[in-house]
Curated annotation (Swiss-Prot):
Record lineage: Bacteria, Bacillati, Mycoplasmatota, Mycoplasmoidales, Mycoplasmoidaceae
UniProt function note: Provides the precursors necessary for DNA synthesis. Catalyzes the biosynthesis of deoxyribonucleotides from the corresponding ribonucleotides.
Name of the protein in question: Ribonucleoside-diphosphate reductase subunit alpha
Site (Allosteric effector binding): 183, 213
Top enzyme category: oxidoreductase
Length: 721
């Protein structure tokens, strides 16, 4: 019987492509191998008929350069013979999509097309070639090494890089931006202008509202004049809607507010389902910055004071964001010159939980947790759209015409991810893999043009901050027959990221010999060595596998675990030579690139062994988990909702010990969960040392024949790499 003869009878539409029907077998009949037939049918029926044919590599390259598809500056770094050889080697790897979703995602979102959208101009191998040419920056031998890492799915650049590398008409290579807004009209106006510029260049932008004076605060000493933060949120939401990135999608933005800002309850109310249209915020993401003191007050069932940012600045000469509310809480409380209002701390957390059930927002950044880990002198005051970027920033000052009086430091980050399963399979090449990944992200930071946002350009040029992450943890665990909620899973996560951290710091230290140190290195905990005490001032066996299973896995894959002596030597080298990058690791959600790589997202468990996605006109697409078969199925059977928040938090906490930034941590709750259950999850994540909480996803009760169980939320495609 042929593949097409196996199409199930329930697909009766005459124009329905066979690959849709074949993919449906994955869910309807549990025949996971049929998804590979769907890939084959998709390539034959859809891709090949729409792919422009060239008779030689030279003809193709000449066409793409002449017609402004490829950037000749990238092409000209190499001889034609080198380009031809890299292309030949790329195709020699005989890359195959592991599932239908991976093929669909590539051709729908990444492949270069003619300007009229009618013809494909690239296969996966061609896109990888353009990435390695760009990331190797003219170094032919390095391009060949990178080719191996990317085309075997060991390392995956973030969407903005993978999509835009080598293109003549492109967006930026940078995934996300973070901007401070200070308490004056010039800063507000400049932030909106910068937001428009960054959003149209495909970036997701997060902005800080903590320092804006509250509603009713004085203006020019006249009381009850300020409108507070809500009108600014409305302006920002309209700006993101207008800058719709060449019509492809609406711009993505988030705003962060400190929990002790007087407008915090109105801030949360903007996401209420029944909010008045005058204040309702539909597409802007919300984030809360919550310090330790808030949890203490809630534990003691006390009132929490909300402090006027206007008065704090007048009294201390510092914005509210730049002080530790936990350390200064009782001083601020006693200061009669600081206006304050009060709400019940437990009521505050109950409201946060209610909003999570209604909308999935707000994100949560644990203020004191991230600042205790901060190796740098200035405070971390916010995060990004996916809550994995945590870096210090400093304010800018402006003239009345919005020109800069003083350029502060704002934040960008260059992202990419290791595929944990493939990285482990790299064995003795593990260190080279991490080194090449760090060098690739560093290159992106050095070639990105961020002149439209001078404060971000300054932050990037001084810090070259990176965010190397990881994905496919559940995939690796399941294929090695380890349950996600087992001690072995936590043990593996701990040792894996311990090993990645060592090689990442080593790579950046070696880069510093070539590129120089990041600007303020001498004032950091890296320079005095104290950051590395956790690896050095411990017993020799402290950072070693605690289970025989994990010890055996590292031996099986021949991945060497760094020793305490390795760290001692590295710490001394870093003190001597410095680091090229202020930040190295951050674990993003990896939505798109996980589908592209046919692997499980980030460190999260799968929602189910076969995920159901809704993709435009195609309708439902069924996505089997990484290497799903009868052997791995039991280890995928309990998905994120069945597992609940505790195992996910345990995994994130294990990794967070070694990640110098944060981890996009999504909590999954069933429809039976209560606000009390959510509050327990916040407290557990807080106590375990997690840096942040991303979305809260709630599986709702739905009609029996519906498969859309989860609250759908707008996500930043630039950030959910």
């Amino acid at each position: 019987m042929s593949v097409k003869e196996k199409i199930p009878a329930f697909n009766t539409q005459e124009d329905l492509e066979s690959y849709i029907s074949l993919n449906a077998y994955t869910k309807v009949y549990g025949d996971f191998k049929m998804d590979l037939h769907a890939v084959e049918a998709y390539i034959q029926e859809h891709v090949k008929p729409k792919t422009k044919v060239f008779h030689s590599t030279k003809e193709r390259l000449d066409f793409l350069v002449k017609n402004d598809y490829y950037d000749e500056n990238i092409i000209n770094m190499y001889s034609f013979e080198q380009f031809e050889e890299i292309t030949r080697k790329a195709y020699a790897y005989r890359f195959r999509y592991a599932n239908f979703m991976g093929a669909f995602k590539f051709y729908n979102a990444y492949a270069l097309k003619t300007f009229d959208g009618k013809w494909y101009l690239e296969n996966y191998e061609d896109r990888v070639v353009m990435n390695v040419l760009f990331l190797a920056n003219g170094n032919y031998n390095k391009a060949l090494k990178l080719l191996k890492q990317i085309i075997t799915n060991r390392f995956q650049p973030a969407t903005p890089t993978f999509l835009n590398a080598g293109r003549k008409k492109r967006g930026e290579f940078v995934s996300c931006y973070l901007l401070r807004i200070e308490d004056n009209m010039e800063s507000i106006g400049r932030a909106i202008t910068t937001t428009l510029q960054l959003s149209k260049r495909d970036g997701g932008v997060a902005l800080l509202l903590t320092n804006i004076r509250e509603s009713g605060a004085p203006i020019k000493k006249i009381e009850n004049q300020s409108s507070g933060i809500i009108p600014i949120m409305k302006l920002l939401e309209d700006s993101f809607s207008y800058a719709n990135q060449l019509g492809q999608r609406q711009g993505a933005g988030a705003v962060y507010l400190h929990a002790h800002h007087p407008d915090v309850m109105q801030f949360l109310d903007t996401k209420r389902e029944n909010a008045d249209e005058k204040i309702r915020i539909k597409s802007l993401s919300l984030g809360l910055v919550i310090p330790d003191i808030t949890f203490t007050l809630a534990k003691n069932n006390e009132e929490m004071a909300l402090f006027s940012p206007y008065d704090v600045y007048e009294e201390y000469g510092k914005p509210l964001s730049d002080i530790s509310v936990t350390e200064m809480y009782y001083e601020l409380l006693a200061n009669q010159r600081i206006k304050k209002t009060f709400i019940n701390a437990r009521k505050f957390f109950q409201t946060v939980a209610e909003l999570h059930f209604e909308s999935g927002y707000p994100y949560i950044l644990f203020d004191d947790t991230v600042n205790r880990r901060n190796a740098h002198p200035n405070r971390i005051v916010m995060s990004n759209l996916c809550s994995e970027i945590v870096q210090p920033s400093t304010p800018s000052e402006f003239h009345h015409d919005l020109a800069f009086k003083k350029v502060g430091n704002d934040i960008s980050c260059n992202l990419g991810s290791l595929n944990i399963a493939k990285a482990m399979e790299s064995g003795p090449e593990f260190s080279e893999l991490v080194k090449l990944a760090i060098e690739s992200l560093d290159l992106v930071s050095r070639v990105s043009n961020l002149e439209t946002a001078p404060s971000i350009q300054k932050g990037n040029s001084e810090n070259h901050a990176l965010g190397l992450g990881a994905m496919n943890l559940h995939g690796f665990l399941a294929t090695n027959q380890i349950y996600y909620n087992s001690p072995e899973a936590i043990d593996f996560t701990n040792i894996f990221f311990y090993t990645v951290a060592y090689h990442a710091f080593k790579a950046s230290s070696e880069l510093a010999l070539e590129k120089g140190k990041f600007k303020n290195f001498e004032n950091t905990k890296f320079a005095d060595g104290s950051y590395f005490d956790k690896y050095i001032k411990v017993e020799p066996d402290f950072w070693t596998p605690k289970t025989e299973r994990v010890k055996a896995l590292f031996q099986k894959y021949q991945v060497e675990i760094p020793t305490r002596e390795n760290w001692k030597e590295l710490a001394l080298n870093i003190q001597k030579n410095g680091l090229a990058n202020s930040h190295l690791l951050a674990i993003a959600p990896t939505g798109s690139i996980s589908y592209l790589s046919s692997c499980t997202p980030s460190l999260q468990p799968v929602v189910s062994p076969v995920e159901v996605r809704k993709e435009g006109r195609l309708g439902r697409i069924y996505v089997p988990a990484y290497q799903l078969n009868k052997d791995s199925y039991p280890f995928y059977k309990d998905g994120a909702y069945e597992l609940g928040p505790e195992p996910i938090i345990n995994i994130a906490a294990a990794a967070q010990q070694h990640v110098d930034q944060a981890i996009s941590l999504t909590l999954f709750m069933t429809d039976k969960a209560t606000t009390r259950d959510l509050n327990k999850a916040y407290i557990y994540a807080f106590k375990k040392g997690c840096s942040s909480i991303y979305y809260v996803r709630v599986r709702q009760e739905v009609l029996e024949d519906s498969e859309d169980h989860t609250i759908q939320m707008q996500q930043c495609e630039a950030c959910v790499i």
